[in-house]
């Protein structure tokens, strides 16, 4: 059976940008519900002894939705850090500059893509097969993990439960908080 992955930091560590209350609901209830539901769906199926990644890449319907949301959320928690924010460094910084010309231009591009990502969704920074970066949007539980030649680097969760307690319906303010928490160390590890 799958278990809810622990947060990689204390439940109040992302304050003031993301509150303890948001994490109590988002991690403790929403993320956990996907785990409970997946554990109820897979006994006796071909997915029973597969890894989470294998399930995400070979399932559909309710099994896919719950497995992908477990994976997406765990990736999201790691995309954030109480010691994050600021400008990127290392290979990711070089790749951002190569694609967008500057960190500010990249931020503007990601913000634009995220603000205009309709409904329950995710915005991802991904590495393409040629080594360049791109920003992609996915809806519902969809994830670039299922795309050949695409490596997820960072994500921002745009389901309303990710920000409604702290920011109500003002997604751009939530994104300002995201930039104060973005985990460039995690991004560089994924890019390598």
Swiss-Prot record:
Its EC number is 1.15.1.1. SUPFAM superfamilies: Fe,Mn superoxide dismutase (SOD), C-terminal domain, Fe,Mn superoxide dismutase (SOD), N-terminal domain. It catalyses: 2 superoxide + 2 H(+) = H2O2 + O2. Transmembrane segments: none annotated. InterPro entries: Mn/Fe_SOD (IPR001189), Mn/Fe_SOD_BS (IPR019833), Mn/Fe_SOD_C (IPR019832), Mn/Fe_SOD_N (IPR019831), Mn/Fe_SOD_N_sf (IPR036324), SOD_C_sf (IPR036314). It comes from the Bacteria. GO terms for molecular function: metal ion binding; superoxide dismutase activity. Keywords: Iron, Metal-binding, Oxidoreductase. Fe cation binds at residues 26, 73, 157, 161. Its cofactor is Fe cation. Binds 1 Fe cation per subunit. Homodimer. Destroys superoxide anion radicals which are normally produced within the cells and which are toxic to biological systems. Belongs to the iron/manganese superoxide dismutase family. This is Superoxide dismutase [Fe]. It comes from Pseudoalteromonas translucida (strain TAC 125). The gene is sodB.
């Amino acid at each position: 059976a799958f278990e809810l992955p622990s947060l990689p930091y204390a439940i109040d560590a992302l304050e003031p940008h993301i509150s303890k209350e948001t994490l109590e609901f988002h991690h403790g209830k929403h993320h956990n519900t996907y785990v409970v539901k997946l554990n109820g769906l897979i006994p006796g199926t071909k997915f029973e002894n597969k890894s989470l990644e294998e399930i995400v890449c070979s399932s559909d319907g309710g099994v896919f939705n719950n497995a992908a949301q477990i994976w997406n959320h765990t990736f999201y928690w790691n995309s954030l850090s109480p010691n994050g924010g600021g400008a990127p460094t290392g290979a990711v910084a070089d790749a951002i500059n190569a694609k967008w010309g500057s960190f500010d231009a990249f931020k503007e591009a990601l913000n634009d893509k995220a603000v205009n990502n309709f409904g329950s969704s995710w915005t991802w920074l991904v590495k393409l097969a040629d080594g360049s970066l791109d920003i992609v949007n996915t809806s519902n539980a969809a994830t670039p993990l299922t795309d050949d030649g695409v490596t997820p680097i960072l994500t921002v969760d745009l389901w309303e439960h990710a920000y409604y307690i702290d920011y109500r319906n003002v997604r751009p303010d939530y994104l300002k908080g995201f930039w104060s928490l973005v985990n460039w160390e995690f991004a560089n590890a994924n890019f390598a």
